[in-house]
A protein has these predicted regions:
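Bacterial N-terminal signal peptides that target proteins for export
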Residues: 1-11
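C-terminal motif of bacterial Sec signal peptides marking the signal peptidase cleavage site
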Residues: 21-22
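Calycin-type beta-barrel ligand-binding domains and close structural analogs
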Residues: 29-58, 65, 82-212
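Short secondary-structure subsegments characteristic of cysteine-rich extracellular domains
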Residues: 62-74
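Long, well-structured alpha-helical subdomains associated
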Residues: 76-77, 83
């Protein structure tokens, strides 16, 4: 084997080894992000404090007072990292505004976590599931359908998760989510899951849900 060929092979091995090490590092980082998300995401949240602040400041379009309950569920037919998410009227908790299934997985590029929001085809069938999480062990792919909006790409930096739509269609308001250890922040949403812009809240467009 001549010297140039040996040198070429050595360089190829170094490049391959470097790429492999980078992929391994990215995979470990995303696994650490998943572990953190599994710890931070579940909980009881409410935006009542923000609603009271809106009212005190005389904002024209006061946000709806909403409670959000997020619990991990063992819905293995849907995915490995699955949560049941229920929104209810904070003034009347028996009034359920939405029920969703949220699934998280590592992105194909190992650089982000991807969140898919699924709609339950028969939401009444799963009502009360927050008290009986084992109920979701029986959920199947044909019990859900893709929800409105995009899959969200999550990244973790400086003690905060941030999630955005990787691709935003023309005319669509970008969806944004932020998660810290004690607060969940969401873009202005109507409860069909679509983003709605509210001009009077442009200075502070995020719903701020404090962990209870």
């Amino acid at each position: 084997m001549n010297r140039d060929l040996r040198l070429g092979l050595s360089l190829a091995v170094l490049v391959f080894s470097g790429a492999l090490a980078s992929c391994t590092t990215d995979s470990k980082l995303r696994e650490a992000d998943l572990d953190r998300l599994r710890s931070w995401y579940p909980g009881n949240y409410t935006n009542v404090a923000q609603v009271e602040k809106d009212m005190a400041e005389g904002i024209a379009d006061v946000r709806e007072p909403v409670n959000i309950l997020i619990i991990p569920v063992a819905a293995l037919a849907i995915g490995d990292n699955v949560f049941y998410v229920q929104q209810s009227d904070a003034m009347n908790p028996q009034r359920i505004l939405s029920q969703r299934i949220h699934r998280f997985e590592k992105g194909p590029d190992e650089l982000t976590l991807i969140q898919t929001i699924l709609t339950l085809k028969q939401p009444e069938r799963w009502r009360g599931g927050e008290m009986q999480p084992d109920l979701f062990k029986g959920i199947r792919p044909d019990d859900v359908q893709a929800g409105p909006g995009c899959a969200l790409a999550w990244t973790f930096l400086e003690s905060k998760f941030t999630a955005n739509c990787p691709v935003v269609a023309e005319g669509q308001t970008p969806l944004r989510v932020e998660l810290t250890i004690d607060e969940l922040r969401l873009a202005d949403l109507s409860f069909n899951g679509r983003v709605k812009a509210v001009p009077s809240r442009s200075a502070d467009p995020l719903y701020r849900f404090e962990r209870q």
